């Protein structure tokens, strides 16, 4: 099987990580894959903030736990030693999609490197708070940014979970011959010529 297809089919969300730190090279490769994600009109509106500082990582975990409504002490990042925050420029109309595509690329890159990852929500709520906007400024990040997601990434602790069964009935084939009748309402000279071809 093609290696890209293999990665697409085998990647899983991981919910148990080893505490071992990742190298800057590993994280750099993951982020590079994210930077090459497709973006609306080529705007490249998404950015990545790579968090390896334990104090900041734990602060984000505690805030995420509070927003999510879990009991104090629960780690929504499942022990992952590194968190990659994805934010996107609010002034770009496709910023949420751009950030989501960046996340997808990075999840696949982590898998290709033999690492585990998981998408964690609530970045929007966090970065709507003044203190987190202030944190961005501390890091030298200016502008209007919306939190898209956190990528928790690290070495997998335990077995990779089996894939969930795919739900049926999620693909519809709109094949040209079977659509002729359905598009009768729109038939004009151009459509008639198309049908005759």
Each model region followed by its residue ranges:
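Acidic, surface-exposed loops and disordered segments
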Residues: 1-197
